[in-house]
Structure formats: C-alpha cells, structure tokens
C-alpha cells in the first residue's frame, strides 16, 4: 500500500453483495467528506468498481479468498456462505491489517465492518483498534435478531405449529407477530439462530451505525440500544447524505427518456432487487396483469432472474410485443433517479431495505411483494405502521396484478398512501439537514473517531 496523507484512516469491510456494498460505500463517502481517508477491504470475488466511482479510496484485496467463488453462495445458501466467509477470512484480514500498520504507521482511526463480516472483530481486538458495526438493514430487523438469538430452534419449530403462538405479538415490537420473524428462506433454523448470535455479539465494537432514520424507527432504535448496551446511531438515508455511484450492475439510462414521455404519477415501476428469481409462468402472469391495468410500467428484469433463462428470450413473442406497447423493460435501472421522476406513481418492490428507503425519500407509495427474511418485516412496516403500501401475497396471477396496480395508481386509497408518503419524504430529508437527527448522528460519529 502506498503512503497516504497524514489524516486518519477508516477501514471499511462490506459484504460482497450489491445491497450491502451500496450503503457501505455511501457511508465511506460521507466520512471521506469529513476528512478521513478510506480503505476498502474486499475479497477476490466481490470487486467494487473502484477506479471509476471512488478514485479517492484505497482498495485492498484480502488474499486467499479465491477458495470462495460466487458459485459457493448458490451451493451453500446465504447462512452457510456467511459462516464460510467468516471462517476463511479472519486470518488473511489480520495479515492485511498487520501489513497496513507496518507500512503506514498507526493511522487507522477505526475499522467499520458490515454486521455479517464479524471476523473483523478479532483483528480489531488483536491490534487494539476501535471498531464499529454497520448494519445495512432496518433497526426492526436488528431487534428481531435479538429475539431470535434467545430462542431454541427445536422449541421454536414445535411452538410455531400452534396457530395461537404464530399470531402472538412479539413483546415491545408491535405489530410484529412471531410468524413475522425473519426465519424463512434461509435454511435450517438452528444455523440461522447461531448466525443471529454471532451478528448480535458486539465483541469489542464501540458503536453500531444503521442506515435508518430515527423518525421511522425510534422505538426499535431505543430497544436495540438497550439490548446491545452501546450507542446506536441512525445515519440514514445515506443515499441522500451523499451522492455516490456504487451500483455493481450496469444501469440502463434509456428508461429515463421513456419516462419523460409519460404523464405525471402514471407509471408503476417494478424491480424485485438484485437476487430474486421468478418462474416463467409468474413473469407471464405479471406481464398480462400489467398490460390489463392500462397503466404504463417500467419493469426491471435482471439477466438470470427468470429461472432457466438468460433474460427474456423464454417469453412468447406476443407477450414481448404486448409489453412493449404499454411498458418498458430494462436489465437494471438507475433506481434513485427513476423513483424521483415525476412520471412514477408507484413502486412494485421486494421491499429490500435500500429500496424501501429510496422509495420513501421520493414520496412514492409501494406494492409490497416480499420474498423472505427482513423483506417481510419491511413490508409489514410499510403496510401497518407507515401505511404507505400494501402487500400482495400468494400466487402471482394476472387479475391480482391488475387490481394491485389500479389500487395504487388509480384508486383513492393509493392517493391517501401517496399523501402519507410525501409527509415521510419531508421528515427524512429534514433528518440529514443541519440540526436533523441523522446530521447530528454523523457529527457524533466523527467525534467518536
């Protein structure tokens, strides 16, 4: 590593996934603007586009991670993949920090690591370096992990066979019920609960930073600080604190030109994130329902997101023609710009936390189609607490798709949701202005370091 300027350096360790890398790089940009140099430690298989988007950052690759190619995620599943990363990366990360300290002197102000990269805690302890945990998910999701870590997987499975237990409210997490806890779609429960215990273990960390906003999750933030016993800083929405291009996927900006030709608040934007896969039959039902709604739509279909297909070549030609009459399909969109476009009236989303925050910041109400884990928690909050969206559950069929789009874009109920979303939009934007809760939290973090 080259000798850097005489200013304190922060080491960032993100999870190798779009939804984690994006807010971590936004955090790095915010701290860089406060005078810190930024070093990003990444694996061989999760390269961030450093030369293009972050020329002022230093990027270091952990050695010996070639044994964990991306295909391992598909084979192991998310929980076991994270265990494997933490097992194989601890020693090489320590070597990385040791080499850095030898070459550049004791200029590391702090190691900030994604909550899933908890192997960093051992290096922070060994070299007596301050560390801070960063969560890219909601505070409510964090609190739910505090609940799960105290449970027995075997007993939980038995208890959840009782419908009454399923509907029981989780203490201090209203309206969350036990059946809403993020346990689905991630593999065996015993390993999930073990991972929750590792994540919630603060080790030697002096604080937790969360990409959320106090006005959205004040009760969960208070509960989390009580559970962890260290300061919890709500620093979001990070994407409006800074403007940092950090997408790992190439964005198709042609859709903005298409949006320019549409009427205000008429378009439904559909994007189910960077991971979700759908069956061809579901995509066909979705396409017909969108067409029948008589509303223009912008639809993100990632390559590989239709099971068994490279992209949309498996769809019948008449469906492609039908979609092109009323809609526009891209492989990936500049989502923040799309949501802020005056033509967009609603967002059909998987309810990942980044997408949820980005939609609220633009005052766009949502159709919630969560698939697993924390997405279901976010959808519950959108529907039952903030009341700026509604869930569509069960089998995807054209009639349900058509009704959902009309409910959001055309009906009075959708207009009411939009009004509430616009109020939240102003609250979130106020949080990052001088004197706002997130603005003040960033100042406190800088002083902490």
From Swiss-Prot:
Enzyme Commission number(s) of this protein: 2.4.1.-
Gene Ontology MF term list: UDP-glycosyltransferase activity
Keywords: Glycosyltransferase, Transferase
Family matches, as SUPFAM superfamilies: UDP-Glycosyltransferase/glycogen phosphorylase
Keyword Transferase tagged: yes
Entry keyword Nucleotide-binding: no
InterPro entries linked: UDP_glucos_trans
Binding of UDP-alpha-D-glucose, residues: 274, 333-335, 350-358, 372-375
Record field: transmembrane: none
Pfam families linked to this entry: UDPGT
Entry similarity comment: Belongs to the UDP-glycosyltransferase family.
Name the record gives this protein: UDP-glycosyltransferase 76E6
Organism of origin: Arabidopsis thaliana (Mouse-ear cress)
